[in-house]
Amino acid sequence: MWRWFLLALLLGSPASVVDAPAAVPDLPAFARTRWVVEGPEEIVTYLAFDPDAVRDRLPSGLRFITVGELADGGVPWARELLGRRPALASWGVSFLELVRARTFTVDGRAPRWPSHGAVALWLARVAPVDQGADLGPGRPLLALDLWVPDRAYARYMRDKGYPAGYGDVHLRRESSGRWLGTVDVPGLEVTVACRPAGPVGGGPMSAGMQAFFPPANSTVTDTVRVAFAGHREQACGSGTSWELRGTHPIVGGVLLGETNYQYGYHLIGGTYPR
């Protein structure tokens, strides 16, 4: 999930690449749960966002990584963006994705998927306020939102330590090859269209690890760590579109770069006390 190469390039640090086909990296021992995703297909885009709009979700000890600090570090897209829109220097960086999967289980239990049911996630890059603090393995991300289209399963995930909520999320592939996705939650409606085009990147040599921290306004306190390998991805070609409507903080975000279709990886995750 969440292809390491493109995310690293876009958000400003080196990718995790090995010289031989990569196995899924080992997670730390003693996970409280086991999350498995296989056969995923997803549409991903990247956004800058106003951190003040979600300040109440930021846990103590963490801070948002900003466009400005990435530009100061020499990240080309960030420097180019600030050249056009300098007011975005203090904004955070994030990604939004809609995912459907052949297998999606937590401790062996899967959601009751509606027709074309999918999961949606909005994740933001964060770092410790104390530069010397150790957040453990994996790129740190704040799980601003995670929506699944099964109310009982959302409760089950929260009980297991995952910061999930209910959302009416769908993702389907038309016979023409175009993907259509929708998200409908209180205060937010999202519609995305993507027709994958061009060369396929990634593949068996991609692998990485991430750590999802729950938002401060969640009843969940565990950290979710995920490890994955085998991403493939294609850029979305002509006719790609995103529509975000409503009062949700993501609606004011600024799209960064291209939208991508990603698939083919294997992911294993688990929850850990923070």
Identify the meaning behind each predicted range.
Residues 16-103, 249-250, 273-274:
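N-terminal domain-onset segments
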Residues 51, 56-65, 146, 150-152, ...:
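Short, structured coil/loop segments at alpha-helix boundaries
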Residues 90-184:
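Aromatic- and glycine-enriched beta-alpha-beta binding-site module
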Residues 4-13:
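Bacterial N-terminal signal peptides
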Residues 20-26, 156-274:
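Interaction-surface and assembly-scaffold signal
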Residues 60, 66-69, 126, 143, ...:
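A short, solvent-exposed, low-complexity linear motif enriched for acidic/polar residues
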Residues 14-15, 166:
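Low-complexity, intrinsically disordered short peptide segments enriched in small/polar/basic residues
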